């Protein structure tokens, strides 16, 4: 009988231990902390995850570099960070932010809905990391402190903020002859606002929280031509979560995409019309070619993932089969 009591006790201890280990910590990057939109969405996610057997604790922070390092060190079981920062954990999804690769927010939502399919489940896993959701943060636009900077040639010699961990931005700045000023996501807005840089790239979602109207002043403008899509990634250590968690998570995130599309559209619409500067229709093909050449160059250097570049080329040509690039094969990677 004693062995039976011992077995019961051991089973009880094991059950308590399993319960104690069940809580997962997700570290959330939100540039404005607990009052931000990302944190609000993650609170909804936290609630939904209970249905998939996870008991998530959220830790919000405003320093994305620290959050990414904590994730690597195992201090967080999951993270919510930008796609550019997430590229180190999964180059496939981390290449959604490739320059000119997703032409607008509508296409971004279509792509992200497609990626939530079980067909792409294997591509979501990279070593000990799994991407369990990709969300749009919006089109990134160039903001200039002087409307006269209205062509690529006029960007030469100007100071442009580049994220210090994104090689793609440094290379692009060099190609147009601009002076790259190393920055991070927490200070690039302030550098623009206080005149340390002349040009930044940012989504409409950053306009209000970072008070970018201060940097625009009376002479500046937002160039109404998306240069890339900013994305958010949810990434986990899958061994810390229940089996099958990743796919359930991706499907939940997919269901939130129309909501995100509406919110981001409103954020753009809320920016006063006076700040927008249109790009002449005749100039657009030139910009498209410039971004395409840069993208191919960056893919050759291994910065962007070939599988994703091919997929996005296919998506773009499905949207607009008459586009000149659809007759070319240099992004149809084998």
PLM-predicted stretches and their roles:
Residues 1-8:
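Bacterial N-terminal signal peptides that target proteins for export
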Residues 71-81, 178-179, 194-203:
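Alpha-to-beta junction loops
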Residues 23-52, 130-194, 198:
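Bilobed "Venus flytrap"/periplasmic-binding protein-like clamshell domains
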Residues 27-107:
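Extracytoplasmic small-molecule ligand-binding "clamshell" domains
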Residues 16-22:
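Sec/Tat signal peptide C-region and signal peptidase I cleavage site
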Residues 83-93, 189-194, 199-225:
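A ligand-binding cleft/hinge motif common to bilobed small-molecule-binding domains
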Residues 9-16:
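Hydrophobic alpha-helical targeting segments used for export or membrane insertion
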Residues 72, 82-175, 212, 226-333:
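Contiguous mixed-secondary-structure segments that line small-molecule binding/active-site clefts
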């Amino acid at each position: 009988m004693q062995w039976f009591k011992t077995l019961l006790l051991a089973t009880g201890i094991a059950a308590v231990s399993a319960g104690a280990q069940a809580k997962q910590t997700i570290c959330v990057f939100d540039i404005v902390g607990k009052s931000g939109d990302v944190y609000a969405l993650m609170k909804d996610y936290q609630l939904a995850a209970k249905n998939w057997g996870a008991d998530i604790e959220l830790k919000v922070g405003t320093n994305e570099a620290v959050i990414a390092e904590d994730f690597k060190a195992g201090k967080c079981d999951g993270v919510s960070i930008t796609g550019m920062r997430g590229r180190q954990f999964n180059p496939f999804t981390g290449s959604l932010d490739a320059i000119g690769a997703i032409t607008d927010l509508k296409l971004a939502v279509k792509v992200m809905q497609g990626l939530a399919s079980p067909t792409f489940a294997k591509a979501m896993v990279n070593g000990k990391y799994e991407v369990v959701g990709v969300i749009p943060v919006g089109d990134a636009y160039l903001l200039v402190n002087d409307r006269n900077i209205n062509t690529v040639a006029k960007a030469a010699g100007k100071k442009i903020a580049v994220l210090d961990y994104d090689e793609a931005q440094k290379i692009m700045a060099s190609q147009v002859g601009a002076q790259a000023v190393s920055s991070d996501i927490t200070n690039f807005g302030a550098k623009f606002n206080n005149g340390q840089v002349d040009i930044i790239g940012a989504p409409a979602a950053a306009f209000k929280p970072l008070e970018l109207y201060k940097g625009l002043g009376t002479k500046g403008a937002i160039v109404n031509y998306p240069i890339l899509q900013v994305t958010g990634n949810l990434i986990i250590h899958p061994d810390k979560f229940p089996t099958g968690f990743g796919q359930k998570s991706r499907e939940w995130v997919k269901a939130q995409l129309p909501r995100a599309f509406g919110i981001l559209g409103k954020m753009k619409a809320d920016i006063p019309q006076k700040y927008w500067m249109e790009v002449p229709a005749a100039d657009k093909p030139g910009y498209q070619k410039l971004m395409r050449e840069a993208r191919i160059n960056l893919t050759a250097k291994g910065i962007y993932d070939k599988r994703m570049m091919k997929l996005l080329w296919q998506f773009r040509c499905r949207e607009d089969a008459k586009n000149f690039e659809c007759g070319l094969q240099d992004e149809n990677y084998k």
